[in-house]
Amino acid sequence: MIKIHGTISLIKIQNLYSELASSNDAVIDVHLPKKIEKLDFGLLFSYLQFLSTWVRNNRSGKLYLPVNNTEEAIEYLDNNEFVYPSIVLAWEKEIVNANGENIKGELKNPSKEYFNRMDFFDLKGNSVPIYCFDHDKSNRGLSRHLYKNFRELVNETTLGFNLFNAFKKVGDFNKGVFRTGVKGHYDDFIAIIHELFTNTHEHAKTNELGYNLYPNIRALQLKFHKKPINKFVEQFQDYAGLVQYFNSGFNVNPQGDLYLLEISILDSGPGFVKRYKRISDYNLNIAEEVEIIKQCLYRHNTSADGFRGEIKGIGLDRVLQTLDGKGFVRIKTGRADVFRDMRNNRYHHHDNASEIQLNDFQNNSKSNFTVYPAAEGTLLSIFYPLEFNQP
């Protein structure tokens, strides 16, 4: 049994992977908390990446919700943004209440209603999630904001139009910041989202052998963060790379608050390493894994064939260029968890991929990378400062 606590953090999520990998249980159930107290940078999608890893584990069992009846279950779903994607990801499992009773049938219609509200950016809070679930070949789980006729990805121009109200919702906290910070960089945000989501469409719907993945999640989250710099530093004091990023001289509002936009993209596909090498096991060392991530970030490198294949390398390289001088990007895939601080480590096109600098997310090292239990898929979480004045 794995119990997820309401005080979950990035470090505690890493511990969940270790707990899953080392468990001697024949069947591993997961118990969800009544609420998650703080959904900070990348936390929601980090949790969902773990849950995807659990779902794919051949010992995964039941998903327990801390509710006693249907009324409580609906309220729990409506008031906690981590619940809906958890239910959909675990739909092939037993989903039970605190008494061990299967409540999946009672959750079907409330989940559809939740999806409809999400589709109109009408959920509570200042976070905007957009989920695509690959259930089967019907494409019924795809977002109309990202797909045309629920089959083809929309182009960049259409995406910008489709997501305008999503960004507007994120900007509701402060209309002035939305106008100057978000709208001033809107094309940048859309470019990042389009490139990264295109990669999930092309490389994360099938496994490394080309077989369709069901169930499978591909998702986008937009989230606004506002805190004084010292509070960000305090919050991420265990991550030297983030501390350095926050101490790099941002322009703040008159109250001393830094405004940040988080853009997170998640998929539960094979991940960079398995896809690029077409391997099913991690029979290589961590330095080689990080090298493969660099290859995926390198212009013109690709694991796919044909014209669209070439776009993969260009796309991820373009993301780094778009973030240059501004953003912070974390990449968690396979057994690696790395980052690139584009503010303190500016973009430069290198002659070979090995020269691209990536740091370990936990220890900040450029060469001594932590080996974690393998995670399914790929998570990219980006911090982008609003009202940043380029020097």
Name what the model sees in each region:
Residues 259-263, 378:
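Short beta-strand element(s) in the Bergerat
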Residues 36, 61-74, 335-337:
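Short beta-alpha junction loops
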